[in-house]
A protein has these predicted regions:
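Domain-level signal for soluble alpha/beta catalytic cores
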Residues: 1-289
Length: 290
């Protein structure tokens, strides 16, 4: 048996990142000082886990504001009103989270919604008809490289394709289905880049799988991951679920070629029953909650 964490709290024991952001918004520190604080915080968190003997340490779980927003930004799901701001990439990202009013423009923040059954709120991704969903960012690999420099091999985490698609708001005339292929291709590119740099494990977080799913939802999930996993080579893929059990889609999950599956045994009332009834792949690692 080995130990793993799905993700580590990012704010800091003394709320370092929150305090640094507030200073940045008040123009009391520079962008470089903010990013340095973030880098030091990531280092501290990785070293804590390493010293605790964690076998599978996660990277890309850090965020200045929200992990869903991070994924949307990584994949160019950025409304035009933010792209038009003549500010840095960091400030565009923060404008999506909290709005921007200044000499370079005036935009409101994206909407916020409750993150499943928690008191946390996420930033709702917004795709317009003109949105070209594709891999454009580098955050995941930059933070993996940071940990690697410390001698720590991590498994990067990213909001999964199904969950991101389901959480996304489509504001134009195009239907949500018109974007499915672009979502899948972007995630295939994420996997390919992880493979290219030698990442050993990639974690897809899919909390949306614990919600009620229609037959159409199941088919969409299977189609998305059949395509993504079709690219699989040496980089292993972990499907991580939480906030309940995956009763509507468990049979489909265990038939796909995931190398690891994370299941919730705390809030997942039927998780043990599902494994007993349908079994679990022999060549797949089971990630469980304590």
């Amino acid at each position: 048996m080995k130990t793993a964490v799905a993700g580590y709290p990012r704010i800091g024991t003394l709320r370092e990142i929150k305090c640094a952001l507030e200073k940045y918004f008040r123009k009391e520190i520079s962008a470089d000082e903010l990013t340095q604080t973030a880098k030091e915080l990531r280092k501290t968190h990785w070293l804590i886990q390493k010293e605790a003997g964690i076998d599978y340490i996660t990277s890309n779980d850090f965020s200045y504001y929200d992990i869903v927003l991070d994924t949307a930004f990584l994949l160019n799901i950025i409304p035009e009103r933010y792209k038009e701001l003549e500010v840095s990439e960091l400030d565009k990202y923060l404008a999506m989270a909290r709005g921007y009013q200044g000499e370079n423009g005036d935009v409101k923040a994206l909407a916020m919604k409750k993150w499943f059954n928690t008191n946390y709120h996420y930033i709702v991704p917004e795709a317009e008809d003109s949105t070209q969903i594709r891999l454009t960012g580098n955050k995941l690999w930059a933070e993996y490289a940071e940990a690697k420099e410390l001698g720590i091999e991590t498994k990067p985490v990213i909001t999964g394709v199904y969950t991101l698609f389901k959480l996304c708001r489509f504001t134009g005339k195009k239907r949500a289905d018109d974007f499915i292929n672009a979502f899948v291709e972007a995630y295939k590119d994420v996997y390919s880049k992880c493979e290219a740099v030698g990442i050993q494990w990639l974690q897809f977080d899919e909390p949306a799988l614990v919600q009620d799913m229609t037959e159409e939802d199941r088919e969409l999930f299977v189609k998305m991951y059949s395509d993504i996993l079709g690219k699989k080579k040496s980089c292993k893929v972990l499907l991580q679920t939480y906030f309940g059990d995956v009763r509507d889609v468990y049979e489909d999950i265990v038939k796909l070629s995931f190398d690891g599956i994370g299941l919730d045994f705390i809030e997942g009332k039927k998780t043990a029953e599902l494994i007993e009834k349908y079994g679990f792949p022999k060549d797949c690692l089971l990630y469980t909650s304590p």
